[in-house]
């Protein structure tokens, strides 16, 4: 049994290291569940209750709850890749183990922050949107692009915006410390994806500069729509080229277009 088969959140965290180590020993691809086990209600984001502002403890706890859900899925997606791609380069898999364990540490930080504010994990529903963006038919380059370059890359943009929104909020220091530490360490996670995407492309004699936009075009219909402005500085630190940043900016505008068109008609 792997960590994504376990429902209780703290048990998931306790088993992630051993799950990753077991996955490293696989010689054949393992099977991941359609959805990971959960001890909380899972609903589509449109069905979630409205959120309170960051000026309240509840609003801050809800934000950490949402962030915990993202870190939880990031942790499980790392394990999923280890389970489903046993033939990936050894260096990639060993480094991914460390990244995945680090995601579990981020999750624990969020859960402890929620409790410090007087709330509990499961007090609000969660979604499985990040997990559902991946598919059993993915190849290793698809998976790296989806998880480490798109989802986690978008998280850098959102995290920076979140840090600025927390400025001036009562009790901000503890919350900001958590968000800042996570966002700083996520730069390394995204850079991990950037480096290995290019290295694996080169090992397969694929031109990564042309593969990036082509592969993104083929995957974009199942990606969650990220609308935060692209943080160019953080993206560069995480290994994105200028052409890749421009692509992300244009993709964001495409995602925003229906909203902008509706506003023009109003």
Residue ranges of model-derived segments:
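Non-heme di-metal
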Residues: 1-266
């Amino acid at each position: 049994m792997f960590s994504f088969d376990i429902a209780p959140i703290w048990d998931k965290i306790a088993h992630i290291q051993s799950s990753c180590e077991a996955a490293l020993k696989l010689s054949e691809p393992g099977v991941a569940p359609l959805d990971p086990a959960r001890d909380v209600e899972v609903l589509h984001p449109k069905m979630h209750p409205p959120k309170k502002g960051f000026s309240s403890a509840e609003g801050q706890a809800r934000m950490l709850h949402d962030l915990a859900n993202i870190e939880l899925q990031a942790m499980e997606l790392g394990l999923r890749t280890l389970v489903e791609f046993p033939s990936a380069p050894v260096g990639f898999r060993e480094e991914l183990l460390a990244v995945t364990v680090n995601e579990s540490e981020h999750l624990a930080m969020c859960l402890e922050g929620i409790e410090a504010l007087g709330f509990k994990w499961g007090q609000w529903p969660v979604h499985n949107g990040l997990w559902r963006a991946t598919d059993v038919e993915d190849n290793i380059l698809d998976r790296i692009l989806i998880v480490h370059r798109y989802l986690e890359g978008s998280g850098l943009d959102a995290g920076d915006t979140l840090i600025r929104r927390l400025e001036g909020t009562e009790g901000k220091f503890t919350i900001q410390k958590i968000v800042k530490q996570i966002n700083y360490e996520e730069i390394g996670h995204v850079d991990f994806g950037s480096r290995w995407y290019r290295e694996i492309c080169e090992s397969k004699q694929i031109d990564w500069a042309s593969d990036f936009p082509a592969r993104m075009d083929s995957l974009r219909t199942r990606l969650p729509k990220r609308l935060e402005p692209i943080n160019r500085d953080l993206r560069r630190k995480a290994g994105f080229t200028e052409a890749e940043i421009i692509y992300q900016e244009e993709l964001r505008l495409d995602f925003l277009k229906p909203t902008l068109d509706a506003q023009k008609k109003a």
